[in-house]
C-alpha cells in the first residue's frame, strides 16, 4: 500500500501511517500559490527567451519540493506524475477578467493598461476548450510545450543528485499521464531520459536507472497495453479517469444529477467512483495481462480513489496488481483490506519469470488441500 502525497508533510504522514512508498505525486499542485504567477508567465510568454526564463524558475522551485518528498521517503519508491491538467486551470477565469476589463473601461484606465488586459483575455480565450478533460492535457502538454517535461525531469534529477551526495537512497519514478498511443510514451520517455542525462553530465553524478512509466486511464491504453508496455517500466491505473471514460460519465455532472436516481432505481449497484465498476475492472485486468505478456516484471498499481476502497482492493488483488495507492488517511484501512485479500483470496500471486519464456500469464486458483 502506497500513498498519494503532493508535499513533504503528506509524505511524512503517509510514512507514519504505514505507506510503503508514494504511488502518486501530483506536480500541478506545486504550481499553485505564490508560484502561480511563474506558470502564468510560462504559458503566456511571447518569446522563447521569456518562456525559458520562466521554465528555469519553475524547475528550481520544484527541485526543492522533490528533494523534501524524496528525502522523507528515503529508500522507498516515489512516483512523480508529470504535469497533467489543462493549462487554462492556472490562468485567470476569463469571465472574471472580462468583468475587470469592463470596469477598467468605465473607470478610464490608460490605453496601455486596456491593451494589455485585452491581449491577456485573448490569450486566455485561445486556451479555453470545449472539453478540457479530453483536450490539451497529460502527455499532450509535453508535445505542445516541450519545455515542461524537460524542466520537471531536470528538477527530479537534480533533487536526486543532491540526496545521493548526502548518502541517501532516493528512488524516484517518473510517470507520464494520459497516454493512449505507444508512440506517445516512446517519445516522452526519450525526452525524459535525455533530460536525466543532461543532469548527469552537468553534475558528474551517475543516477542509474530511473523508472519511467505511464498512467493507464483511457480505454484504448488498457486494450493496447502490450504495445505501451514496450516503453514503460510500470503502469499505474488511474481509475478515476478510466471510470469516466469507460462509462461515459462526467463525474462532476453525474454524481449530483444521474447517480442518485440510478442507485435508487437499482440501475447500478453502487457508486462506480467509490467501488470499481466490473467493466472498468475488466479493462484493468486486460491491461495487466497484456502488459505482463509484453514486459514480464512490469510493476502494476492503482492510484485512483479506488485504491483506498476495501471492495476495490480485493478486486485489484485478484487481478494481480502489485500495489494500490490512496490518500494518507486511508492507508491504514487499505492495509487492512490488502491483508484480508492476501489471506482469503483463492488466486495465486504472480511469480516473476524470465522474459524469454514468459507467455501471457494466467491466474490459477490454489489446489484444494489433500
Locate the predicted segments by residue:
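Conserved alpha/beta-domain cores
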Residues: 1-347, 357, 366-370
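Intrinsic low-complexity/disordered segments
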Residues: 361-363
Amino acid at each position: 500500500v502506497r500513498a498519494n502525497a503532493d508535499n513533504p508533510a503528506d509524505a511524512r504522514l503517509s510514512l507514519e501511517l504505514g505507506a510503503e512508498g508514494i504511488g502518486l505525486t501530483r506536480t500541478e499542485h506545486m504550481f499553485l500559490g505564490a508560484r502561480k504567477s511563474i506558470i502564468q508567465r510560462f504559458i503566456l510568454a511571447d518569446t522563447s527567451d521569456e518562456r525559458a526564463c520562466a521554465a528555469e524558475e519553475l524547475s528550481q522551485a520544484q527541485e526543492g519540493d522533490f528533494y523534501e518528498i524524496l528525502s522523507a521517503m528515503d529508500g522507498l519508491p516515489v512516483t512523480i506524475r508529470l504535469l497533467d491538467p489543462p493549462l487554462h486551470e492556472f490562468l485567470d477565469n476569463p469571465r472574471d477578467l472580462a468583468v475587470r476589463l469592463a470596469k477598467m473601461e468605465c473607470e478610464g484606465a490608460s490605453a496601455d493598461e486596456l491593451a494589455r488586459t485585452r491581449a491577456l483575455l485573448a490569450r486566455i480565450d485561445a486556451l479555453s476548450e470545449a472539453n478540457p478533460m479530453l483536450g490539451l492535457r497529460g502527455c499532450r502538454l509535453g508535445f505542445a510545450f516541450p519545455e515542461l517535461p524537460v524542466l520537471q525531469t531536470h528538477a527530479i534529477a537534480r533533487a536526486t543528485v543532491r540526496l545521493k551526495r548526502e548518502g541517501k537512497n532516493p528512488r524516484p519514478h517518473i510517470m507520464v499521464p494520459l497516454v493512449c498511443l505507444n508512440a506517445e510514451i516512446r517519445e516522452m520517455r526519450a525526452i525524459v531520459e535525455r533530460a536525466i542525462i543532461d543532469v548527469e553530465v552537468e553534475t558528474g553524478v551517475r543516477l542509474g536507472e530511473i523508472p519511467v512509466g505511464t498512467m493507464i486511464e483511457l480505454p484504448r491504453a488498457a486494450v493496447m497495453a502490450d504495445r505501451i508496455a514496450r516503453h514503460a517500466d510500470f503502469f499505474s491505473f488511474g481509475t478515476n479517469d478510466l471510470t469516466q471514460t469507460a462509462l461515459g460519465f462526467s463525474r462532476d455532472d453525474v454524481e449530483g444529477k444521474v447517480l442518485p436516481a440510478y442507485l435508487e432505481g437499482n440501475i447500478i449497484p453502487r457508486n462506480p467512483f467509490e467501488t470499481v465498476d466490473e467493466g472498468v475492472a475488466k479493462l484493468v485486468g486486460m491491461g495487466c495481462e497484456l502488459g505482463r505478456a509484453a514486459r514480464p516484471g512490469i510493476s502494476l498499481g492503482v492510484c485512483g480513489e479506488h485504491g483506498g476502497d476495501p471492495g476495490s482492493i480485493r478486486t485489484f488483488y485478484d487481478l494481480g496488481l502489485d500495489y494500490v495507492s490512496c490518500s494518507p488517511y486511508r492507508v491504514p484501512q487499505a492495509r487492512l483490506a490488502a491483508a484480508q485479500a492476501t489471506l482469503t483470496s483463492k488466486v495465486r500471486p504472480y511469480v516473476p519469470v524470465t522474459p524469454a519464456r514468459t507467455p501471457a500469464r494466467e491466474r490459477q486458483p490454489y489446489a484444494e488441500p489433500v
